[in-house]
Amino acid sequence: MSDESNPPKVILLVEDSKADSRLVQEVLKTSTIDHELIILRDGLAAMAFLQQQGEYENSPRPNLILLDLNLPKKDGREVLAEIKQNPDLKRIPVVVLTTSHNEDDVIASYELHVNCYLTKSRNLKDLFKMVQGIESFWLETVTLPAA
């Protein structure tokens, strides 16, 4: 339960893998942090949501974005670039959560001002711990700008 002085944290997960998004959802279900998880499956939907366009015109502003790089319709790299170039969106922390170990992807993401780049573990237990770490750091430890 939240009140107006302490609204739930809004987490936007942009992930086309249903298995990976289910895992993030399961980890966050165990959370003591009041939150709302919104899952979108492609980059076009993510940008429409963030820019409050079309069916997303009343969407909440996320406190944190978890972004896969390899997305349909609009690549995660393009989404990241658009977020960080938009004055209304650029302060929202973006964590890239991807399977890519490619050094060029890491460098390109940081050049686009990603806040954190994490490579998904193939081991479910390790991936579970990684998502718990994201939650702990980004939703409990740091001070985020108001949504």
From Swiss-Prot:
Can you supply a Gene Ontology BP term from the record? phosphorelay signal transduction system
**Alphabetically ordered keywords of this record:** Phosphoprotein, Two-component regulatory system
Q: How is it modified after translation?
A: Phosphorylated by Cph1.
Matching entries from CDD domains are given as: REC_Rcp-like
* Superkingdom assignment: Bacteria
The organism's lineage is:
Bacteria, Bacillati, Cyanobacteriota, Cyanophyceae, Synechococcales
Domain Response regulatory spans what residues? 10-135
Primary role: Forms a two-component system with Cph1 in which it acts as receiver substrate.
The gene that this protein is the product of is: rcp1
State what protein this is by name.
Answer: Response regulator Rcp1
4-aspartylphosphate is carried by which residues? D68
